[in-house]
Curated annotation (Swiss-Prot):
It comes from Schizosaccharomyces pombe (strain 972 / ATCC 24843) (Fission yeast). Residues 243-262 form a propeptide. One of its GO terms (cellular component) is Golgi membrane. Belongs to the UPF0619 family. The lineage of its organism: Eukaryota, Fungi, Dikarya, Ascomycota, Taphrinomycotina. This is UPF0619 GPI-anchored membrane protein C1322.10.
Length: 262
């Protein structure tokens, strides 16, 4: 007994789920123009079959007419048709049927209200139509999105800027600083003078006397260009003069001693 109740509820649930899809257009007040673009719209839920067969049906007149327009995704939400009907077919009492597309569910899922056709195509064979579904657009596909190439994304995400002083500039700056320091140091420690701002030449001289015996004179000059010159000379005139004077004094003292002895 419980098994039968469970089975009945199962099929009832499937039946209710199958009929969740609902046709919203065409309606009773709709008139399709034969041979022109006409639109079918519907709403669906996640429990509806993924695919549905679209049928154009007329059960209001005998013989009944059933035309298979094609299969669409139930999630599409709309489709366009370009159907023309032959001149012998009725212009009223038409409906759109949504049927199951699988062998497990081939029954009708939903039907539209009856609508009319206006016009016909006299070149068509009796009880025939031409055209059918020529486009089916999902409602969700109307939204658009743009994507950043990996390569651009990579370039954008990895792009950074850094500033560093070139090695040549650093070396030049260091050399200039050293040269400036050398010039300043030389000018501060010597009695020389900078003769030209452009040439940056430093000259210096010094004199020294050692014990009164010799005198040495040294002069030097240097430039920022890297050239330097120096000269030195030593004079012994002081030593010779002192020696002669001492000999003279000794001679005088010797003569005086001889005179006293005599």
């Amino acid at each position: 007994m419980l098994a039968r109740v469970g089975t009945t509820l199962f099929f009832l649930a499937n039946a209710l789920a199958a009929y969740a899809v609902s046709v919203t257009s065409p309606t009773r007040d709709t008139t399709w123009q034969s041979g022109q673009v006409n639109t079918v719209t519907w709403s669906s839920v996640s429990t509806d079959p993924e695919e549905m067969v679209i049928m154009l049906v007329n059960n209001a007149h005998y013989p009944n007419q059933n035309f298979n327009l094609g299969t669409v995704q139930s999630s599409a939400g709309s489709l366009d048709t370009d159907i023309s009907i032959s001149s012998d077919l009725p212009t009223d009492g038409w409906q759109i049927y949504f049927n199951g597309a699988t062998s497990q569910n081939q029954g009708s899922l939903a039907q539209s209200e009856q609508f009319d056709f206006e016009g016909s195509d006299s070149t068509l064979a009796a009880s025939t139509i031409s055209g059918g579904i020529y486009s089916s657009t999902s409602a969700s596909s109307t939204s658009s999105s743009t994507a950043t190439p990996s390569s651009s994304s990579t370039t954008s995400s990895s792009s950074s800027s850094s500033s560093s002083t070139p090695i040549s500039s650093s070396i030049t700056s260091s050399i200039s600083s050293s040269a400036s320091s050398s010039v300043s140091s030389s000018s501060a420690s010597s009695s020389g003078s900078i003769s030209s701002a452009d040439a940056k030449t430093v000259s210096a001289s010094s004199n020294s006397t050692i014990s009164g015996f010799s005198t040495s004179t040294t002069s030097a000059s240097s430039s920022a260009a890297g050239n330097s010159s120096s000269s030195s000379y030593t004079s012994y005139s002081g030593a010779v003069s002192n020696g002669v004077a001492q000999l003279s004094v000794a001679a005088c003292m010797g003569i005086a001693a001889l005179m006293l002895i005599a």
